[in-house]
UniProtKB/Swiss-Prot annotation:
InterPro entries documented for this protein: Ald_DH/histidinol_DH, Ald_DH_C, Ald_DH_CS_CYS, Ald_DH_CS_GLU, Ald_DH_N, Aldehyde_DH_dom, Proline_metab_enzyme, RocA
Active-site feature positions: E286, C320
Organism taxonomic ancestry: Bacteria, Bacillati, Bacillota, Bacilli, Bacillales
The protein's name in its UniProt record: 1-pyrroline-5-carboxylate dehydrogenase
Pathway membership: Amino-acid degradation; L-proline degradation into L-glutamate; L-glutamate from L-proline: step 2/2
Disulfide partners: none
Record key words, sorted: NAD, Oxidoreductase
Catalytically driven reaction(s): L-glutamate 5-semialdehyde + NAD(+) + H2O = L-glutamate + NADH + 2 H(+)
Pfam families: Aldedh (PF00171)
Catalytic activity, EC: 1.2.1.88
GO molecular function, one term: 1-pyrroline-5-carboxylate dehydrogenase activity
Length: 515
C-alpha cells in the first residue's frame, strides 16, 4: 500500500540546522568540482576525448565538471542498446518500475542538500531556488510512480454477457529526452522517469551548460536498481547528436523542454517518416512563454507589486513561467509601478552560494548578451526605472530591470527575453488588459490580481494560458497540484506533473474476448 502523494516540503533556512546542513552540501560538492563524467550506454561507462565543460555561471573560472561528449557513432550504439533493452523492459512489472522511482526519490531526499548545492554551482541558483528544484525532482518521481500504479490495469470499459473487453496501456518504445538548463534537475528527472516508469527506454541528452547534475542523477538511478540500458546518458551537440536521434527511425517519441525555435525544429524533423520507420513519432514539447500578470483596479496592490517582482526576478527571470509583462489598470498603474520599483531595488544580486542572495547570474555568455540586448531595446521602448546594468567580468550578472510605459505592441511585450527584465504596460480597463495579455504567440502562464469575482471568472474563460493563477504570482507550479504546460507556441500542453502526462508516453490497446 503506497501512502497518498503530497509534495516535498521546502527547506526553511531560518532554522540553523537546515542552514548548516546546506553548507555541508556545498562543501561536499566543492570537494568533487572539476571531475570528469562518462557517457553511460547499456551500463558501460564510456570516456571520450571530446568534453562538455561545465562552469559556474557566477564564477567563470570555477570548473564544475567535464562530461564526455557523444558522437553520432556512440549515439547509434546507445540507440541499439535502448531498442534491444526495450524488448524486455516493456514487459517488466509496473509495480517494479514504480518502486525504482520511489527508491530514487528516497536517495535524492537523503542527498537533498548535495543536489541543491550542485544546482547552486552549475545553474547559479540561490539556495531557495535550488532547494525548490530538488524538491520538484523528488515530487516528479513520487507522483509518476503513483500514477503508473493507477494506470497499470488500464481504464474500465463496457463489456457484455458475451464478451470481455479491456482497455490497457502499453509503452511506446525508445524515447529521446532533451532536457533544459533552467531546471536541470527537476525537469530532467521528471521527463526521464515519466518515460521509464511507463515502460519505455530512454536516451537522455541533457542541456550542455548543466550536464553534471544529470550525470549525478544517473548514479541515483543505478543505485535505485534501474537495469542497465533502460536510461542511456548521451550528452552532446544538438546539431550532431540531437538531430541524429530525433531523425532516427527507431525513435518512437521525443520529449523536449527548451526554446521555441529548437522546439519547432524538433517538431518538424520528427514529423518526417524516414526509411525503415514504421510509426509516426510522438512529440512532447514545452517551449517557453511570454507571461503576464494582470492587475485590476479592484485589487490588493501590495500583493500585486510583490507578485510581479517575485515572478519576474526569481532565478533571474530564467523560468518559462516568469513574469515578463505587467499589465496594469491605468487607475492603479503608478502605485503598483512605484512599489514594484522600490521592491526591486531591495533585491541583492550576488554569489548564489551565499545565503540571502536574491538573484544570481544568468546562464552563460549567450544568455547575458541576449538579455542585455533587450535592455538596450527597453531604453528605446520605455523608461528604465530599476536595473539596466550588467557585469560579465567574473560571472554573468544582470541587475533586475523594470521598463515602464511600454506600448502594447512593442518588442518588449512580444518577444521572449528569458532574463530579469519586465515590461510595464497600462490598460484602459479589464477587457483591454486581457486583450493585451492574449496578444502573444505564447500561452504558458498568467496571473490576475483582482478582488472582482466577475473578472476572475471572465479571466478563467478568456485568458488563454495553460496555467492561470489568481491573486498570486505566475511561477511555482507544484507537481500534482498545478499540472504544467501551455498553449500555442508554448508547446503541446503536455501538463507535466498531471494525471494524463504518463499516457503521452504510452499507447492504448483494446482487447475483446468472446465468452
Amino acid at each position: 500500500m503506497v501512502v497518498a502523494y503530497k509534495h516535498e516540503p521546502f527547506t526553511d533556512f531560518s532554522v540553523e540546522a537546515n542552514k548548516l546542513a546546506f553548507e555541508e552540501g556545498l562543501k561536499k560538492v566543492e570537494s568533487y568540482l572539476g571531475q570528469d563524467y562518462p557517457l553511460i550506454i547499456g551500463g558501460e561507462k564510456i570516456t571520450t576525448e571530446d568534453k562538455i565543460v561545465s562552469v559556474n555561471p557566477a564564477n567563470k573560472e570555477e570548473l564544475v565538471g567535464r562530461v564526455s561528449k557523444a558522437s553520432r557513432e556512440l549515439a547509434e550504439k546507445a540507440m541499439q542498446v535502448a531498442d534491444e533493452t526495450f524488448q524486455t523492459w516493456r514487459k517488466s512489472k509496473p509495480e517494479m518500475r514504480a518502486d525504482i522511482l520511489f527508491r530514487a526519490a528516497a536517495i535524492v531526499r537523503r542527498r537533498k542538500h548535495e543536489f541543491s548545492a550542485i544546482l547552486v554551482k552549475e545553474a547559479g541558483k540561490p539556495w531557495n531556488e535550488a532547494d525548490a528544484d530538488t524538491a520538484e525532482a523528488i515530487d516528479f518521481m513520487e507522483y509518476y510512480g503513483r500514477q503508473m500504479l493507477k494506470l497499470k490495469d488500464g481504464i474500465p470499459v463496457e463489456s457484455r454477457p458475451i464478451e470481455y473487453n479491456r482497455f490497457s496501456y502499453i509503452p511506446l518504445g525508445v524515447g529521446v529526452i532533451i532536457s533544459p538548463w533552467n531546471f536541470p534537475f527537476a525537469i530532467m528527472a521528471g521527463m526521464t522517469t515519466a518515460a521509464l516508469v511507463s515502460g519505455n527506454t530512454v536516451l537522455l541528452k541533457p542541456a550542455s551548460t548543466t550536464p553534471v547534475v544529470a550525470a549525478k542523477f544517473m548514479e541515483v538511478l543505478e543505485e535505485a536498481g534501474l537495469p542497465a540500458g533502460v536510461v542511456n546518458f548521451v550528452p552532446g551537440n544538438g546539431s550532431e547528436v540531437g538531430d541524429y536521434l530525433v531523425d532516427h527511425p527507431r525513435t518512437r517519441f521525443v520529449s523536449f523542454t527548451g526554446s521555441r525555435d529548437v522546439g519547432i525544429r524538433i517538431y518538424e524533423r520528427a514529423a518526417k517518416v524516414n526509411p525503415g520507420q514504421i510509426w509516426l513519432k510522438r512529440v512532447i514539447a514545452e517551449m517557453g512563454g511570454k507571461d503576464t500578470i494582470v492587475v485590476d483596479k479592484e485589487a490588493d496592490l501590495e500583493l500585486a507589486a510583490k507578485s510581479i517582482v517575485a515572478s519576474a526576478f526569481g532565478f533571474s527571470g530564467q523560468k518559462c513561467s516568469a513574469c515578463s509583462r505587467a499589465v496594469i489598470h491605468e487607475d492603479v498603474y503608478d502605485h503598483v509601478l512605484n512599489r514594484a520599483v522600490e521592491l526591486t531595488k531591495e533585491l541583492t544580486v550576488a554569489n548564489p552560494a551565499v545565503l540571502g542572495t536574491n538573484m544570481g547570474p544568468v546562464n552563460d555568455q549567450a544568455a547575458f548578451d541576449k538579455v542585455m540586448s533587450y535592455v538596450a531595446i527597453g531604453k528605446e521602448e520605455g523608461r528604465i526605472l530599476a536595473g539596466g546594468e550588467g557585469d560579465d567580468s567574473k560571472g554573468w550578472f544582470i541587475q533586475p530591470t523594470i521598463v515602464a510605459d511600454v506600448a502594447e505592441d512593442a518588442r518588449l511585450m512580444k518577444e521572449e527575453i528569458f532574463g530579469p527584465v519586465v515590461a510595464f504596460c497600462k490598460a484602459k480597463d479589464f477587457d483591454h488588459a486581457l486583450a493585451i495579455a492574449n496578444n502573444t504567440e505564447y500561452g504558458l502562464t498568467g496571473a490576475v490580481i483582482t478582488n472582482n469575482r466577475d473578472h476572475i471568472e471572465k479571466a478563467r474563460e478568456d485568458f488563454h494560458v495553460g496555467n492561470l493563477y489568481f491573486n498570486r504570482g505566475c511561477t511555482g507550479a507544484i507537481v500534482g497540484y498545478q499540472p504544467f504546460g501551455g498553449f500555442n507556441m508554448s508547446g503541446t500542453d503536455s501538463k507535466a506533473g498531471g494525471p494524463d502526462y504518463l499516457a503521452l508516453h504510452m499507447q492504448a490497446k483494446t482487447t475483446s474476448e468472446t465468452l
